[in-house]
């Protein structure tokens, strides 16, 4: 079985369990230090979206980050390779502003220049990096914006942790190998001409220990101070990227 089908089956199973239990995850459930990059991701989206925008979310999962998009009043097309995950989204959000569509991000079933904005929250590793970049650029309108939050694969501590998840059967090998790195961000810069990035969480691996010792608020401040004191890039856990199509 291909890695793509392994991941599809995994997420279909998780989505079915969520539907059966009526228990849906949200980015808002993250601890404060880990939620910081998602807050920034949402703030960048808020700067470029309005109720007339047509937004494509790739790798939407069970809608962990879709609620914020819908709250802006924009029309949202949530896509994922897992049909059961999209079923969760449809159950969670009953609005005519939402469209769901089963789609492979390597070959999006949309015409060129269809969307004002494309967003991705943690999904860029679920397709061939070059093919996904090509498809994102293709479906964006001129002056359209791509905004993403994802993990960065340059820190050896985080790379080791992802490999442990693979050994435990929680991730496929191709997914961890395609986790974005600085070289991939350079490809986005070459394609779009210019990108804006911000990096977070050089000490996120210490978060559980810090929270036990200091609590969430102080731990968040410590993490922020470390990120600001040092020019974190290679050591980052997460990044937020914004690129505009010329």
Language model: regions and residue ranges:
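Conserved class I S-adenosyl-L-methionine
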Residues: 1-50, 147-170
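A conserved beta-strand element that flanks and buttresses the S-adenosyl-L-methionine
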Residues: 119
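A short glycine-rich, Lys/Arg-flanked "PGG" loop and its adjoining helix->strand segment in the class I
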Residues: 131-142
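A C-terminal cap/extension of S-adenosyl-L-methionine-dependent methyltransferases
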Residues: 165, 198-246
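Short alpha-helix
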Residues: 176-193, 197
């Amino acid at each position: 079985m291909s890695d793509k089908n392994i991941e599809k089956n995994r997420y279909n199973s998780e989505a079915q369990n969520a539907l059966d239990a009526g228990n849906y995850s949200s980015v808002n459930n993250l601890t404060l230090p880990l939620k910081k990059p998602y807050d920034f991701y949402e703030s960048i989206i808020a700067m470029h979206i309005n109720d007339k925008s047509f937004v494509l979310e790739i790798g939407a999962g069970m809608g962990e980050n879709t609620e914020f998009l819908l709250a802006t009043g924009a029309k949202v097309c949530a896509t994922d390779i897992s049909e059961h995950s999209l079923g969760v989204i449809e159950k969670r959000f009953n609005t005519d502003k939402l469209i769901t569509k089963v789609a492979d991000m390597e070959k999006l079933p949309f015409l060129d220049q269809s969307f004002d904005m494309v967003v991705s929250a943690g999904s860029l590793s679920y397709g061939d990096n070059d093919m996904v970049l090509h498809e994102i650029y293709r479906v964006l309108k001129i002056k359209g914006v791509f905004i993403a939050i994802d993990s960065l694969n340059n820190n050896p501590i985080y790379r080791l942790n992802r490999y442990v998840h693979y050994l435990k059967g929680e991730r496929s090998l191709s997914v961890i190998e395609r986790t974005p790195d600085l070289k991939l961000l350079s490809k986005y810069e070459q394609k779009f001409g210019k990108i804006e990035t911000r990096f977070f969480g050089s000490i996120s691996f210490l978060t559980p220990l810090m929270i036990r010792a200091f609590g969430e608020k102080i731990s968040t401040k410590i993490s922020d101070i470390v990120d600001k004191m040092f020019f974190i890039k290679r050591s980052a856990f997460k990044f937020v990227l914004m690129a505009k199509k010329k």
